[in-house]
Amino acid sequence: MTITMNGKEYNIKFGNKAVARAGFISKLAKIGVMQSDPDDSVGAIEGMEQMYLLMPQIILAGLQANHSDEFGYNLTTGKDRDEQLGKVEDMLDHFVDEENGDFLKLQEDVTNEILHNGFLKRLFEEETAKAQDQIQK
């Protein structure tokens, strides 16, 4: 998956280690469940709000494989993660505010990438099932 921000193309690849350390799959599944009920406008709004908070973490994880020179951090210890996350947040702010980027389209593209990527698809489906079970209880 390739995204263009600040006039630069970034090749997003969700590697296993970066995704596992980022811990966003279960959060993303819960957001999907919140947004899936067409009669729950509050859940949809909360889901959108949570997605705004989560997107920088997802993008940062996806940047680790091909752009660690610019956005890399120690995946084992988390050293420098907050600094790199801040850079991604600034990049997303610029994308939305200055470039008139479509955040919802970006969210859709990233979610589709996760849903169609082999190991991520399976993880996402498992976490979605867990989230649905928790909501039904």
Predicted regions and their residues:
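Short, surface-exposed, low-complexity cationic segments
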Residues: N16-D39
